[in-house]
Design a protein with these regions (language model features):
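Hydrophobic "anchor" residues on beta-strands that sit immediately upstream
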Residues: 22, 105-106
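Short, solvent-exposed loop/turn segments at secondary-structure junctions
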Residues: 28-31, 69-71, 111-113, 138-140, ...
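Acidic, metal-coordinating catalytic cores used for nucleic-acid/nucleotide bond scission
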Residues: 82-84, 106-118, 136-142
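A general structural motif
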Residues: 18, 101-103
Length: 211
């Protein structure tokens, strides 16, 4: 419920006006860097787009993204590994531009790199100014950054052809700026506290848990 409450407050701008920032963060690990053996043939009259099925692998990329909930702007960085050791410094870089904020609410899922002993100790060091909110188990869809990653991947990565890992990383960083210029906007989140409570109270057999 806390996460939904913050999303609803964004619509009234009340949280931002108090000098507080809400940021969602998520990772998309192990994105395959694939080089197609033949160029993709673009769509034309009477013919769908054709993509070569044979490819050469050039490793993987771990994409971490942050979503500034108030304005929908995207922050992106590619990590060498998808683990807590690389996640924690990335969080510092994500939060760095908001040194002016009285408080930052960071929404993340329950991934192992987010809940390890070292990462939890790291979050305690940042507390109380940095308030971490975990999505419920199997509730990562409540994290708006997950929706951002899906939309970003479909628009900028889905039909990619990469001759090296470095080229894909540079494309992601360049595309972040393009996304912020052309598409960034606050998400309209339909799943409200009221809808959640109605569902909770009218669905038999549910196991109650804190959200």
């Amino acid at each position: 419920l806390k996460i939904l409450w913050y999303y609803e407050r964004i619509e009234t701008r009340s949280v931002w006006q108090r000098g507080e920032v809400i940021i969602c963060a998520d990772e998309k690990p192990n994105i395959q860097v694939l080089e197609r053996m033949m160029p993709t043939q673009p769509m034309r009259s009477g013919q769908i787009e054709r993509q070569e099925f044979e490819y050469k692998r050039h490793g993987t990329v771990n994409l971490m993204t942050g979503l500034i909930v108030y304005n929908g702007r995207m922050w992106a960085e590619c990590l060498d590994k998808n683990d807590g050791e690389h996640f924690r410094p990335a969080v510092r870089r994500l939060l760095h531009p908001y040194g002016w904020a009285k408080r930052i609410h960071l929404i993340i899922d329950n991934g192992s790199s987010h809940t390890s002993d070292d990462t939890m100790a790291f979050f305690r060091e940042l507390s109380p100014r940095i308030h971490v909110l975990f999505t419920p188990v199997d509730g990562s869809w409540l994290n708006q950054a997950e929706s951002l990653l899906e939309a970003f991947g479909e628009r900028y990565l889905l039909r990619g052809n990469w001759m090296s890992r470095e080229l894909m990383i540079q494309h992601i960083l360049d595309s972040q700026s393009d996304y912020n210029q052309r598409f960034a906007h606050p998400f309209q989140w339909e799943w409200s506290c009221r809808k959640f409570l109605y569902w909770l109270n009218n669905t038999p057999g549910l196991i109650r848990c804190k959200t």
